[in-house]
Amino acid sequence: MPKKQDINKILIIGSGPIIIGQACEFDYSGTQACKALRRLGYQIVLVNSNPATIMTDPDVADITYIEPLNVDRLTQIIEKERPDALLPNLGGQSGLNLCSELSEAGVLEKYNVQVIGVQVDAIERGEDRIEFKHTMQKLGIEMPRSEVAYSVEEAVKIAEQLKYPVVLRPAYTMGGAGGGMVYNIDELKVVCARGLQASLVGQVLVEECISGWEELELEVVRDANDNVITVCFIENIDPIGVHTGDSFCSAPMLTISEDVQKKLQEYSYKIVKAIEVIGGCNCQFAHDPVSGRIV
């Protein structure tokens, strides 16, 4: 990859503490990115709240800050270091959320910091439940029946229409954080309140339950020239309803027909191109082996 001549100093946001959705793979990928970018001649400024990581070792970045990952502290660091670019997508959900918040607050524009590795509007299309749903509708890709709620009261009304059990998915979270499956109104009130608090924008998707369907995934990579490749096809052994972090999986898929795999690949390519993902992306699908429905 040729070096961009308009960039000298790059700010990288670390993933912070190791929790569900913010696991050690982000530390590994962030460390490799720091090393690769430094070899290309870039100066690296790293911000991470977790000192117990490889990426915060003294020889990984040129300048390392062990600071809380929030907008105020990032703004202070940007003001002091004046990076030319921000690389947020190696910090997991924390990095993506902070990038969106910094952009919305006008910090990136004020200090002339360009975002590399991902576009800010791509984060919104992928993370905001309404935007993502509209994008899928334009592509003709079916999704589970769902509605967005901004309060517990709204969620209760939607769940009554969809019928219990339902799944709650907070926006701008990863790994199921703050959400879950609920079987009655009492559970919904507790989980929805937690999900609204966990969501960056106070938004929760109330979705029909499709437990028991096959859970299938594709890892795809797209570059800036719109070239897309499939890294692997993944078949979860346990059905939908069991968290992927607790499920065995096989790569490649062993029991899924070639026709279904081709359809999943077609959908994945449409999705990453529509959202304009640059880099790696995990696309998750549910497949009903009885009806053949894919969402």
Task: Give the role of each language-model region.
Residues M1-V295:
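N-terminal beta-alpha lobe that positions the nucleotide/phosphoryl donor
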